[in-house]
Structures are given as structure tokens and as C-alpha cells.
């Protein structure tokens, strides 16, 4: 019987249990009760399964929230699974750039830096850039903005992000009737001289997480929509709770954003 190895990855503080599902039966890891237990035991924000590639993609990505819900994209999860593919020795078929399929469609992933030190050292990380889906439509509502960057996000600008009660206010907005029936993730953003400082309440986790890749992407696009200045057009630096990330994009007509990229660190934390 093949023993499934569990890997814990962290993408800028967003932690995941990751499984190599290319060989053996991993169907048990899709069960809600199993996902809940693993995410609780390993203190992660989700579980991912890397699946086999085919003639079109190098691998597939399945993402599940700690409550077992799936069907959405996770940006930091996408960066971590690209690092995981590199760790496993998977070679991209297309010019050094990985192609992978997630629930929201096709993505690319590129390794910009590889670990150069031991686990826990300042250089033990990958720097990964992934291409997100094109985004069209930003809807002003409830004192903020709503959009979909692979999953649903509400973005609200605040004067001091450190003073926000993210769990209380985030929960109220997450379940607001305007977002019924499935709700939304909620991001609070402070525009600072060094970039956008972001805190996120994630549905499925039902609390604040240390980072959210699709949320950071949403915040950058909303910042552009709202006219927030940036040193480089179509590029924003964003501070999650533990790390800096960047979002680059090409704005177009009718609030359509293409060539949307999320870049940041990914680390292999432990193996079980």
C-alpha cells in the first residue's frame, strides 16, 4: 500500500497541506471530514492536490478550504503548487514556464528564484510568479468594491488597517445579503507610502488569514480603478501580514484587466 506523503507549504503566510496525487488513490483526501482534520492538525488555510498533466498542461491543481469547500482558485496556493511541482522535479514542457489547470481555468507559473539555503534560513524560499485569470467588472457597493479574481472578493479602503476588527467586520460583510447565497471574501486596504497594506477575511476559513493571493490581486485592481497612484503603471506592491507581494496587470477598456500576474515567496515548511 502506497503511503501518501503530506507536505506543508507556506505562501507569504498562507499555509497549505499539499499532496502529490499523480500516483495512487487520493480520493479519501477529498472527503470533507478528512480535509477538516488535516487543516486543523497542521494549522493550514487549505489542502491542495497536484494531479497528473496531459498533452495540454504540466499538472492540475485542486484546492479545498478548511471546511471542505472547493471549486475556486487560490492565488497563494497556486504559487505554492508551482513551487511543489519544481520540488518534485516536474519539468515544464513550454519554455521553462509551467502550465497548470485549476478550477477557474488555465494558469501559468514561473520560478524566478529557487531555495539557496537550509529550511528556515532567509534563502529557503522560491519566488514564484503565476498568471491569474483575466478580470472584467468592478462593482461599487456597500462602501467598497466587488469583483471576481478566480473567487469572489469585496475590497474596502480604510484609514488604519491595524485598527480594523477583521473577524467581526469581515464576518458581517462576508454574510451580507448583497452577496447571497454563497457570500464573499473581504479585504481591508490601507494606502501607505510603501504600498497597499492588506488584511483579509476568507470564507471557507471563516476568519482572518495571513495572506490571500486572489484577495491581493483584487486589491491591486481596485486600487487602479480608484485611481490610487503607483510608481509603475499597472503594478502594485502589497503587504500581507508577513510578506510583500506584487501584482502586475494590463488595464483595458470596459474595466477589463489582462496579463494579471501575482508574484511572491513560497516555502516548504515541513514533510510528514
Task: Report each predicted region and the residues it spans.
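Internal active-site segments that recognize and position negatively charged phosphoryl groups
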Residues: 138, 142-163
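A glycine-rich beta-to-alpha transition motif near the start of alpha/beta enzyme domains, typified by
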Residues: 1-124, 155-272
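Active-site glycine-rich loop that binds ribose-phosphate moieties when present
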Residues: 130-143, 168-171
Amino acid at each position: 500500500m502506497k503511503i501518501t506523503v503530506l507536505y506543508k507549504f507556506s505562501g507569504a503566510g498562507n499555509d497549505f497541506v499539499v499532496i502529490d496525487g499523480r500516483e495512487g488513490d487520493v480520493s479519501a483526501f477529498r472527503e470533507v471530514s478528512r480535509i477538516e482534520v488535516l487543516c486543523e492538525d497542521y494549522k493550514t488555510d487549505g489542502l491542495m492536490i497536484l494531479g497528473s498533466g496531459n498533452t495540454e498542461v504540466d499538472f492540475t491543481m485542486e484546492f479545498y478550504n478548511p471546511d471542505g469547500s472547493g471549486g475556486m482558485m487560490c492565488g497563494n496556493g497556486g504559487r505554492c503548487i508551482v513551487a511543489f511541482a519544481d520540488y518534485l522535479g516536474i519539468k515544464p514542457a513550454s519554455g521553462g514556464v509551467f502550465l497548470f489547470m485549476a478550477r477557474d481555468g488555465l494558469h501559468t507559473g514561473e520560478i524566478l528564484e529557487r531555495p539557496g539555503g537550509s529550511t528556515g534560513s532567509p534563502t529557503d524560499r522560491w519566488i514564484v510568479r503565476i498568471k491569474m485569470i483575466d478580470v472584467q467588472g468592478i462593482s461599487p457597493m456597500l462602501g467598497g468594491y466587488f469583483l471576481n479574481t478566480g473567487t469572489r472578493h469585496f475590497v474596502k479602503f480604510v484609514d488604519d488597517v491595524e485598527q480594523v476588527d477583521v473577524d467581526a467586520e469581515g464576518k458581517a460583510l462576508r454574510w451580507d445579503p448583497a452577496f447571497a447565497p454563497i457570500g464573499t471574501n473581504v479585504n481591508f486596504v490601507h494606502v501607505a507610502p510603501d504600498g497597499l497594506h492588506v488584511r483579509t477575511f476568507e470564507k471557507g476559513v471563516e476568519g482572518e488569514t495571513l495572506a490571500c493571493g486572489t484577495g491581493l490581486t483584487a486589491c491591486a485592481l481596485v486600487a487602479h480603478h480608484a485611481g490610487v497612484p503607483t510608481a509603475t503603471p499597472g503594478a502594485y506592491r502589497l503587504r500581507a501580514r508577513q510578506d510583500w507581494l506584487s501584482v502586475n496587470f494590463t488595464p483595458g477598456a470596459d474595466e477589463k484587466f489582462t496579463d494579471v500576474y501575482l508574484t511572491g515567496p513560497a516555502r516548504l515548511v515541513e514533510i510528514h
